[in-house]
Amino acid sequence: MNILYKRRFWEIDFLRAIAIFMMITFHIVFDIDYFKNYNLVSPYNFWWYFARATATLFLTLVGISLTLSYSRIIHLSKNRDFRKIYIKYIIRGMKIFSWGLLITFITFIFLRKGTILFGILHLIGVSIILAYPLLKFRILNLIIGVFFILLGLFISNFYVEYPWLIWLGVKTTNFYTFDYFPVLPWFGVVFIGIFLGNIFYPNYKRSFKLPDLSKNLMVKHLCFLGRHSLIVYLIHQPVLIGLLYMVGMIDISTLFHIFSCIFNFFRI
């Protein structure tokens, strides 16, 4: 029985790897656009929708993964102390949120304009902490998810003069950032993922038939990538920028100038 609850569902890791490739593809386009000013990414064009489709897939998988981890912990725990289980989720959420804060710091230092204040890692960290009490429900998560999405779309048309509600989805008039995934509407996507996880993987069991492709060499490598999506997310942009610079597709002299100023500042 324990072996059953320790196994992974290869399709989740595979889909996460697909989302990673979509993310990398978009960021290649975005980096070229940013450094060359080609205007490739603009509101409501193909790449704008592509980025949101990528985020939707990522966050849906976050919700599904939360239900899987919850089911696994519940069935493997000899003592079902829900308080201790919740503490594990809080710690996990805080770790991911901390990585988001690191990205906030780095983008503030190197970019200034477009600083990432509440990106996808911030959202995932908060979602892991806040979603825990509702992980066992089905329809309720669907209702909450749809409500959050609709409410988020509604409040996106309103602007305020203070920045304290940016995390929620209420922006200031001249707000600009490179990565923005506020609680409303994007937490709603996580809730829908939780709903789907409870439908398709009840009690850590697949409710549908699927061929086992986990031994396929290509699938196996992709699943490995999917299992390490956080590491890929954290390192892929510096790697992409370095590669694009090496092949002469972008000029990052501005970043070198900023880095030099920071170095000289700390030498004083």
Where are the language model's segments positioned?
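Alpha-helical transmembrane segments and their immediate juxtamembrane cytosolic regions
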Residues: 1-268
